[in-house]
Protein backbone atom coordinates (compact mmCIF):
# COMPACT_ATOMS: atom_id res chain seq x y z
CA UNK A 1 0.00 0.00 0.00
CA UNK A 2 1.30 3.44 -0.90
CA UNK A 3 0.64 6.00 1.83
CA UNK A 4 -0.01 9.49 0.51
CA UNK A 5 0.42 11.83 3.46
CA UNK A 6 -1.15 15.22 4.13
CA UNK A 7 2.03 17.03 3.09
CA UNK A 8 1.74 15.63 -0.44
CA UNK A 9 -1.96 16.47 -0.62
CA UNK A 10 -1.40 20.00 0.70
CA UNK A 11 1.15 20.50 -2.08
CA UNK A 12 -1.59 19.72 -4.61
CA UNK A 13 -3.91 22.19 -2.90
CA UNK A 14 -1.30 24.95 -2.76
CA UNK A 15 -0.52 24.48 -6.44
CA UNK A 16 -4.13 25.26 -7.37
CA UNK A 17 -5.14 27.61 -4.54
CA UNK A 18 -1.99 29.50 -3.56
CA UNK A 19 -3.87 32.56 -2.26
CA UNK A 20 -7.48 31.48 -1.99
CA UNK A 21 -10.27 31.31 -4.56
CA UNK A 22 -10.55 34.80 -6.07
CA UNK A 23 -13.85 34.17 -7.88
CA UNK A 24 -15.67 32.64 -4.90
CA UNK A 25 -14.38 35.33 -2.56
CA UNK A 26 -15.28 38.14 -4.95
CA UNK A 27 -18.84 36.82 -5.30
CA UNK A 28 -19.28 36.81 -1.53
CA UNK A 29 -20.00 33.07 -1.51
CA UNK A 30 -17.20 31.91 0.77
CA UNK A 31 -19.29 31.40 3.91
CA UNK A 32 -22.36 29.94 2.20
CA UNK A 33 -23.22 26.30 2.97
CA UNK A 34 -23.14 23.75 0.18
CA UNK A 35 -22.86 20.12 -0.82
CA UNK A 36 -20.66 18.41 -3.40
CA UNK A 37 -21.12 15.02 -5.03
CA UNK A 38 -18.69 13.32 -7.42
CA UNK A 39 -19.88 10.54 -9.71
CA UNK A 40 -18.15 8.42 -12.33
CA UNK A 41 -18.60 9.69 -15.86
CA UNK A 42 -18.24 6.18 -17.28
CA UNK A 43 -17.08 2.67 -16.47
CA UNK A 44 -13.73 2.71 -14.68
CA UNK A 45 -11.56 1.32 -11.90
CA UNK A 46 -11.65 3.88 -9.10
CA UNK A 47 -8.37 5.17 -7.67
CA UNK A 48 -7.50 7.77 -5.04
CA UNK A 49 -11.03 8.44 -3.85
CA UNK A 50 -9.62 8.34 -0.30
CA UNK A 51 -7.06 11.02 -1.13
CA UNK A 52 -9.73 13.14 -2.83
CA UNK A 53 -11.86 12.98 0.31
CA UNK A 54 -8.86 13.94 2.43
CA UNK A 55 -8.18 16.97 0.22
CA UNK A 56 -11.68 18.28 0.94
CA UNK A 57 -11.25 17.55 4.65
CA UNK A 58 -7.95 19.43 4.77
CA UNK A 59 -9.78 22.47 3.43
CA UNK A 60 -12.36 22.29 6.20
CA UNK A 61 -15.22 20.37 4.58
CA UNK A 62 -16.82 17.20 5.87
CA UNK A 63 -16.33 14.46 3.28
CA UNK A 64 -17.08 10.75 2.93
CA UNK A 65 -15.97 7.99 0.57
CA UNK A 66 -18.80 6.38 -1.39
CA UNK A 67 -16.58 4.08 -3.48
CA UNK A 68 -13.19 2.82 -2.34
CA UNK A 69 -10.12 2.59 -4.56
CA UNK A 70 -9.93 -0.63 -6.54
CA UNK A 71 -13.67 -0.92 -7.12
CA UNK A 72 -14.96 -1.10 -10.70
CA UNK A 73 -17.95 1.14 -11.30
CA UNK A 74 -20.31 2.14 -14.08
CA UNK A 75 -21.15 5.67 -15.15
CA UNK A 76 -23.24 7.58 -12.64
CA UNK A 77 -22.09 5.74 -9.52
CA UNK A 78 -21.20 7.99 -6.59
CA UNK A 79 -17.53 8.27 -5.67
CA UNK A 80 -17.64 10.74 -2.78
CA UNK A 81 -19.87 13.22 -0.98
CA UNK A 82 -18.92 16.40 0.87
CA UNK A 83 -20.57 19.32 2.60
CA UNK A 84 -19.38 22.51 4.20
CA UNK A 85 -18.66 26.11 3.33
CA UNK A 86 -18.65 26.89 -0.37
CA UNK A 87 -15.11 28.29 -0.08
CA UNK A 88 -13.81 24.89 1.06
CA UNK A 89 -15.85 22.89 -1.44
CA UNK A 90 -14.87 24.93 -4.48
CA UNK A 91 -11.23 25.21 -3.42
CA UNK A 92 -10.95 21.43 -3.29
CA UNK A 93 -13.36 20.55 -6.08
CA UNK A 94 -11.01 20.56 -9.07
CA UNK A 95 -7.99 19.31 -7.15
CA UNK A 96 -9.96 16.29 -5.96
CA UNK A 97 -11.68 15.76 -9.30
CA UNK A 98 -8.46 15.94 -11.30
CA UNK A 99 -6.76 13.51 -8.93
CA UNK A 100 -9.54 10.93 -9.22
CA UNK A 101 -9.79 11.34 -13.02
CA UNK A 102 -6.06 10.95 -13.59
CA UNK A 103 -5.48 8.16 -11.07
CA UNK A 104 -8.56 6.25 -12.18
CA UNK A 105 -7.35 6.48 -15.77
CA UNK A 106 -4.10 4.79 -14.75
CA UNK A 107 -5.95 2.21 -12.68
CA UNK A 108 -8.39 1.46 -15.50
CA UNK A 109 -5.55 0.98 -17.98
CA UNK A 110 -3.79 -1.35 -15.55
CA UNK A 111 -7.01 -3.33 -15.08
CA UNK A 112 -7.42 -3.70 -18.85
CA UNK A 113 -3.82 -4.87 -19.39
CA UNK A 114 -4.03 -7.36 -16.52
CA UNK A 115 -7.33 -8.73 -17.84
CA UNK A 116 -5.93 -9.14 -21.36
CA UNK A 117 -2.79 -10.91 -20.15
CA UNK A 118 -4.63 -13.17 -17.72
CA UNK A 119 -7.11 -14.21 -20.37
CA UNK A 120 -4.16 -16.17 -21.79
CA UNK A 121 -2.59 -17.19 -18.47
CA UNK A 122 -4.32 -16.43 -15.15
CA UNK A 123 -0.98 -16.68 -13.32
CA UNK A 124 0.83 -13.96 -15.29
CA UNK A 125 2.08 -10.87 -13.44
CA UNK A 126 1.84 -7.36 -14.87
CA UNK A 127 4.46 -5.13 -13.23
CA UNK A 128 4.62 -1.37 -13.75
CA UNK A 129 7.91 0.49 -13.98
CA UNK A 130 8.97 3.64 -12.17
CA UNK A 131 8.61 5.71 -15.34
CA UNK A 132 6.06 8.29 -14.23
CA UNK A 133 5.37 12.00 -14.53
CA UNK A 134 7.93 13.68 -12.24
CA UNK A 135 6.53 14.27 -8.78
CA UNK A 136 3.69 11.76 -9.15
CA UNK A 137 5.42 8.42 -8.54
CA UNK A 138 3.72 7.43 -5.29
CA UNK A 139 0.29 8.37 -6.62
CA UNK A 140 1.01 6.63 -9.94
CA UNK A 141 2.12 3.41 -8.28
CA UNK A 142 -0.87 3.52 -5.95
CA UNK A 143 -3.16 3.86 -8.97
CA UNK A 144 -1.69 0.95 -10.93
CA UNK A 145 -1.67 -1.35 -7.90
CA UNK A 146 -5.34 -0.75 -7.13
CA UNK A 147 -5.89 -1.50 -10.82
CA UNK A 148 -4.51 -5.00 -10.29
CA UNK A 149 -0.89 -4.62 -11.40
CA UNK A 150 2.18 -4.89 -9.21
CA UNK A 151 5.30 -2.73 -8.97
CA UNK A 152 8.46 -3.50 -10.92
CA UNK A 153 10.59 -1.13 -8.85
CA UNK A 154 9.87 2.05 -6.92
CA UNK A 155 13.29 3.53 -7.61
CA UNK A 156 16.99 2.81 -7.89
CA UNK A 157 17.35 1.71 -4.27
CA UNK A 158 15.12 -1.35 -4.12
CA UNK A 159 16.24 -3.62 -6.96
CA UNK A 160 19.16 -4.53 -9.21
CA UNK A 161 18.69 -3.65 -12.88
CA UNK A 162 21.71 -3.75 -15.20
CA UNK A 163 21.35 -1.39 -18.17
CA UNK A 164 23.50 -0.98 -21.26
CA UNK A 165 24.52 2.35 -19.76
CA UNK A 166 26.19 0.45 -16.90
CA UNK A 167 27.86 -1.97 -19.29
CA UNK A 168 29.30 0.93 -21.28
CA UNK A 169 31.75 1.46 -18.41
CA UNK A 170 32.67 -2.20 -17.96
CA UNK A 171 34.95 -3.06 -20.84
CA UNK A 172 34.69 -5.84 -23.42
CA UNK A 173 33.40 -8.50 -21.00
CA UNK A 174 31.08 -6.13 -19.13
CA UNK A 175 27.94 -8.26 -19.43
CA UNK A 176 29.33 -11.38 -17.76
CA UNK A 177 31.63 -9.53 -15.37
CA UNK A 178 29.00 -7.12 -14.10
CA UNK A 179 26.36 -9.83 -13.69
CA UNK A 180 28.83 -11.87 -11.64
CA UNK A 181 29.71 -8.87 -9.50
CA UNK A 182 26.06 -8.00 -8.87
CA UNK A 183 25.23 -11.57 -7.90
CA UNK A 184 28.10 -11.57 -5.43
CA UNK A 185 27.35 -8.10 -4.05
CA UNK A 186 23.57 -8.45 -3.82
CA UNK A 187 22.92 -12.15 -3.10
CA UNK A 188 19.38 -11.52 -1.83
CA UNK A 189 18.31 -9.69 -4.99
CA UNK A 190 17.45 -11.04 -8.40
CA UNK A 191 19.74 -9.66 -11.10
CA UNK A 192 17.60 -8.11 -13.82
CA UNK A 193 19.29 -7.28 -17.12
CA UNK A 194 17.75 -5.08 -19.79
CA UNK A 195 18.64 -6.36 -23.26
CA UNK A 196 18.20 -4.95 -26.75
CA UNK A 197 18.11 -8.05 -28.96
CA UNK A 198 17.78 -11.83 -28.91
CA UNK A 199 21.52 -12.53 -28.89
CA UNK A 200 22.09 -10.21 -25.95
CA UNK A 201 19.22 -11.82 -24.05
CA UNK A 202 20.66 -15.31 -24.49
CA UNK A 203 24.14 -14.10 -23.54
CA UNK A 204 22.78 -12.48 -20.38
CA UNK A 205 20.96 -15.67 -19.41
CA UNK A 206 24.14 -17.68 -19.99
CA UNK A 207 26.05 -15.24 -17.78
CA UNK A 208 23.64 -15.71 -14.87
CA UNK A 209 20.90 -13.11 -15.28
CA UNK A 210 17.79 -14.15 -13.38
CA UNK A 211 15.36 -11.83 -15.16
CA UNK A 212 15.64 -10.72 -18.78
CA UNK A 213 13.97 -7.39 -19.46
CA UNK A 214 13.18 -7.29 -23.18
CA UNK A 215 13.00 -3.63 -24.08
CA UNK A 216 10.34 -2.97 -26.73
CA UNK A 217 10.67 -6.43 -28.29
CA UNK A 218 7.98 -7.38 -30.84
CA UNK A 219 6.13 -10.64 -30.06
CA UNK A 220 8.16 -12.69 -32.53
CA UNK A 221 11.43 -11.68 -30.85
CA UNK A 222 9.98 -12.52 -27.45
CA UNK A 223 9.18 -15.97 -28.86
CA UNK A 224 12.73 -16.32 -30.18
CA UNK A 225 14.18 -15.54 -26.75
CA UNK A 226 11.92 -18.06 -25.01
CA UNK A 227 12.76 -20.73 -27.59
CA UNK A 228 16.48 -20.02 -27.29
CA UNK A 229 16.42 -20.29 -23.51
CA UNK A 230 15.05 -23.81 -23.63
CA UNK A 231 12.93 -25.62 -21.03
CA UNK A 232 15.61 -25.86 -18.34
CA UNK A 233 16.26 -22.15 -17.77
CA UNK A 234 14.59 -21.17 -14.49
CA UNK A 235 14.56 -17.39 -14.75
CA UNK A 236 11.87 -14.95 -15.85
CA UNK A 237 11.26 -13.13 -19.11
CA UNK A 238 9.78 -9.63 -18.87
CA UNK A 239 8.54 -7.77 -21.92
CA UNK A 240 8.95 -4.05 -21.22
CA UNK A 241 7.92 -0.90 -23.03
CA UNK A 242 4.87 -0.31 -25.15
CA UNK A 243 2.68 -2.91 -23.43
CA UNK A 244 -1.03 -2.17 -23.83
CA UNK A 245 -4.31 -4.01 -23.43
CA UNK A 246 -4.20 -4.62 -27.20
CA UNK A 247 -0.84 -6.43 -27.25
CA UNK A 248 -0.60 -7.94 -23.76
CA UNK A 249 -2.22 -11.20 -24.83
CA UNK A 250 -0.07 -11.69 -27.98
CA UNK A 251 3.03 -11.01 -25.89
CA UNK A 252 1.97 -13.53 -23.26
CA UNK A 253 1.26 -16.23 -25.86
CA UNK A 254 4.91 -16.13 -26.92
CA UNK A 255 6.35 -17.62 -23.75
CA UNK A 256 5.77 -19.38 -20.46
CA UNK A 257 8.19 -17.65 -18.08
CA UNK A 258 6.69 -14.23 -18.29
CA UNK A 259 5.83 -11.34 -16.03
UniProtKB/Swiss-Prot annotation:
Which GO molecular-function terms appear in the entry?
nicotinate-nucleotide diphosphorylase (carboxylating) activity
Q: Which GO terms describe its cellular component?
A: cytoplasm
**Domain of life, per lineage:** Bacteria
SUPFAM superfamilies, A to Z: Nicotinate/Quinolinate PRTase C-terminal domain-like (SSF51690), Nicotinate/Quinolinate PRTase N-terminal domain-like (SSF54675)
Annotated GO biological process: NAD biosynthetic process; quinolinate catabolic process
Q: Does the keyword Repeat apply?
A: no
Q: Which Gene3D superfamilies match?
A: Aldolase class I, Quinolinate phosphoribosyl transferase, N-terminal domain
Protein EC? 2.4.2.-
- For the keyword Glycosyltransferase, the answer is yes
Q: Which UniProt keywords apply?
A: Glycosyltransferase, Transferase
Which family is this protein grouped under? Answer: Belongs to the NadC/ModD family.
Q: Report the NCBIfam families cross-referenced here.
A: modD (TIGR01334)
The identity of this protein, by name, is Putative pyrophosphorylase ModD
Organism, scientific name: Rhodobacter capsulatus (Rhodopseudomonas capsulata)
Q: Name the lineage.
A: Bacteria, Pseudomonadati, Pseudomonadota, Alphaproteobacteria, Rhodobacterales
